């Protein structure tokens, strides 16, 4: 090797996990031999160190250089004869002058074979805190592996690593005295002695041929020595899978495998996510399209759906007033008008002569489905039908024309022809007739709901109920009246005939003003309860609102013969 040996030692300040094959793994308190200091050979921030016979780079900020002691004698290189099967060489007794091994004097004359003498076990016990029985196991070659035990805080048993040091440098590092004289010639790397790098090769070869010699710390993948002691620290999984990996010391350091030998994932998370997305896309592409979702019946369909455009008749309109239909633009008018609802017996009269389009629309058997049919307007809010409601509505003249429709209530509307002012009859175009037919039926349902809500509110007021009971009834009144106002506003914008727009806007404006007054009166009655004048004002406003709603509904009914 071209690297010159060094006597500089460094102590590990933190645990380190190797992230590359060139990096060493160590734990806090380990003593490493510095081969090249930081900055030497282009290693900025790294030191080239040796630990347990392994060389690698070490982060310079995780180790601390120890003060250099006096150079030891070169007698450590040729070690004393080693006993066969014993992994720990015994350096010469001339090492007593070194400052690295702070060991009491009785530890030196400890015998190397056979049962130890009396003064030998007490000294190692005070230094390494090992069981007393381990001092008597130096005779057998396999039992010699348990001589170098570490403090109980580390809970580890030494292995065949040539550099077996305690976990903390605060403890004395010398345990070479009890070694038999016949051990291997591989010296410890801990003493401050220059050792030729050529002497490390036979040491590694001698270790490779011996089975019970795994290192204590995590070893790279190139040194695969299976033993139960590998589980004490972080070890690669392929080493733990060997047959000898089931010792009693397994799981002492139960930490995740963070080293470079962690088993790679068969597929990265990003690839898994992309694979799942591709699979989902294929399933969606093969699946049939979802069935058409039917529209739910809702009384608010007029406000939720865009209004269609009025069809422009091919024949000129008989109305003398110019039609502004071609000038109306926008998304609301760009869609065809839905087919009109079925004619009511009372409202269905002979169509305007010369109107072929309306007749074709009625006679067309393949017409589009009317999405506005079957909407139960009067029953949406689940009004409470009180007993006195039928009597109050029975006094009003029933509309004989409405009896043919089972969906419309039998409360009845007044005769529609009575609301028309005397004069020349209004000429309505085909598109306006379709709008009137559609919204006239809607107004009948809205007015029926308004009647039920007004009857419930009047009954609650007569019973002198608190606001928490009559305010919900007033909300239903406001909602039903607001739908009528919306119908008037829509007809005022979409009607092609100017006289028709004027009449509808006038009736809708009066209804909106009555609705605004009713809302203010209900708020005043709720805040001033139990004030009789406030209740009376609310009753008057509700009565006026009901009258305006009746006039508006009658107007639309009369305009759609």
UniProtKB/Swiss-Prot annotation:
Domain of life: Eukaryota
Coiled coil: none
GO biological process: cell adhesion; cell migration; cell surface receptor protein tyrosine kinase signaling pathway; intracellular signal transduction
Bias type Pro residues, positions: 103-123, 308-325
Residue ranges with Basic and acidic residues bias: 352-372
UniProt motif (SH3-binding) ranges: 305-311, 335-341
InterPro entries registered for this protein in UniProt: CAS_C, CAS_fam, EFS_SH3, SH3-like_dom_sf, SH3_domain
GO molecular function annotations of the record: protein domain specific binding; SH3 domain binding
Region named Disordered: 68-123, 171-215, 240-372, 390-422
Span of domain SH3: 5-68
PROSITE patterns on file: SH3 (PS50002)
Expression by tissue: The protein has been detected in lung and placenta.
Region ranges (Divergent helix-loop-helix motif): 438-488
Phosphotyrosine: modified positions: 253
Cellular component aspect of the GO annotation: cytoplasm; focal adhesion
PTMs per UniProt: Phosphorylated on multiple tyrosine residues. Phosphorylated on tyrosines by FYN and SRC.
Protein purpose: Docking protein which plays a central coordinating role for tyrosine-kinase-based signaling related to cell adhesion. May serve as an activator of SRC and a downstream effector. Interacts with the SH3 domain of FYN and with CRK, SRC, and YES.
Domain-related comment: Contains a central domain (substrate domain) containing multiple potential SH2-binding sites and a C-terminal domain containing a divergent helix-loop-helix (HLH) motif. The SH2-binding sites putatively bind CRK, NCK and ABL SH2 domains. The SH3-binding sites that bind to the SRC SH3 domain are required for interaction with CRK and are implicated in promotion of serum response element (SRE) activation. The SH3 domain interacts with PTK2/FAK1.
Annotated family: Belongs to the CAS family.
Protein name per its UniProtKB record: Embryonal Fyn-associated substrate
Gene name per UniProt: EFS
């Amino acid at each position: 090797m071209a690297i010159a040996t060094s006597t500089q030692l460094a102590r590990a300040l933190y645990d380190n996990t190797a992230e590359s094959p060139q990096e060493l793994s160590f734990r806090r308190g380990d003593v490493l031999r510095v081969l090249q200091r930081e900055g030497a050979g282009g290693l900025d921030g790294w030191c080239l160190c040796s630990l347990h016979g392994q060389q690698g780079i070490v982060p310079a900020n995780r180790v601390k250089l120890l003060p250099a002691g006096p150079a030891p004698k070169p007698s450590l290189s040729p070690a004393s004869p080693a006993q066969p099967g014993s992994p720990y060489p015994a350096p010469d007794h001339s090492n007593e002058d070194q400052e690295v091994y702070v060991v009491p004097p009785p530890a030196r004359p400890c015998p190397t074979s056979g049962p130890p003498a009396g003064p030998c076990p007490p000294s190692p016990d005070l230094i390494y805190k090992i069981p007393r029985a381990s001092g008597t196991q130096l005779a057998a070659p396999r039992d010699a592996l348990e001589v170098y035990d570490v403090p109980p805080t580390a809970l580890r048993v030494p292995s065949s690593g040539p550099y077996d040091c305690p976990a903390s440098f605060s403890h004395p590092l010398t345990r070479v005295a009890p070694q038999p004289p016949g051990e291997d010639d591989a010296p410890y790397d801990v003493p401050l002695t220059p050792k030729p790098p050529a002497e490390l090769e036979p040491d590694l070869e001698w270790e490779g041929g011996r089975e019970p010699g795994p290192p204590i710390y995590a070893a790279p993948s190139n040194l695969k020595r299976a033993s139960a002691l590998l589980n004490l620290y972080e070890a690669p999984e392929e080493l733990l899978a060997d047959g000898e990996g089931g010792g009693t010391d397994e799981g002492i350091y139960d930490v995740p495998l963070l080293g470079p030998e962690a088993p790679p994932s068969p597929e990265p998370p990003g690839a898994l996510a992309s694979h799942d997305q591709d699979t989902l896309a294929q399933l969606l592409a093969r699946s049939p399209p979802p069935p058409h979702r039917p529209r739910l019946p809702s009384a608010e369909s007029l406000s939720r759906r865009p209004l269609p455009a009025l069809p422009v008749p091919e024949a000129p309109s008989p109305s003398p007033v110019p039609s502004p239909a071609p000038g109306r633009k926008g998304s609301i008018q760009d869609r065809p008008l839905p087919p009109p609802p079925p004619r009511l017996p009372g409202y269905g009269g002979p169509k305007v002569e010369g109107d072929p389009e309306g007749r074709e629309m009625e006679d067309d058997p393949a017409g589009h489905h009317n999405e506005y049919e079957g909407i139960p307007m009067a029953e949406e809010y689940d009004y409470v039908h009180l007993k006195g409601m039928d009597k109050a509505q029975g006094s009003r003249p029933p509309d004989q024309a409405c009896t043919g429709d089972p969906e419309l209530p039998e409360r009845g509307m007044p005769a529609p022809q009575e609301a028309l002012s005397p004069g020349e009859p209004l000429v309505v175009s085909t598109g306006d007739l379709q709008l009137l037919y559609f919204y006239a039926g809607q107004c009948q349902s809205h007015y029926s709901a308004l009647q039920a809500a007004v009857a419930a509110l009047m009954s609650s007021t007569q019973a002198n109920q608190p606001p928490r009971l009559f305010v919900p009834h007033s909300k239903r009144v406001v909602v039903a009246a607001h739908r009528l106002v919306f119908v008037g506003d829509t007809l005022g914008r979409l009607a092609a005939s100017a006289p028709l727009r004027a009449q509808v806007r006038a009736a809708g404006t009066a209804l909106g003003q009555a609705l605004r007054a009713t809302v203010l009166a209900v708020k005043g009655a709720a805040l001033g309860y139990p004030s009789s004048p406030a209740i009376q004002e609310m009753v008057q406003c509700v009565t006026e609102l009901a009258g305006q709603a009746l006039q508006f509904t009658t107007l639309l009914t009369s305009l759609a013969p």
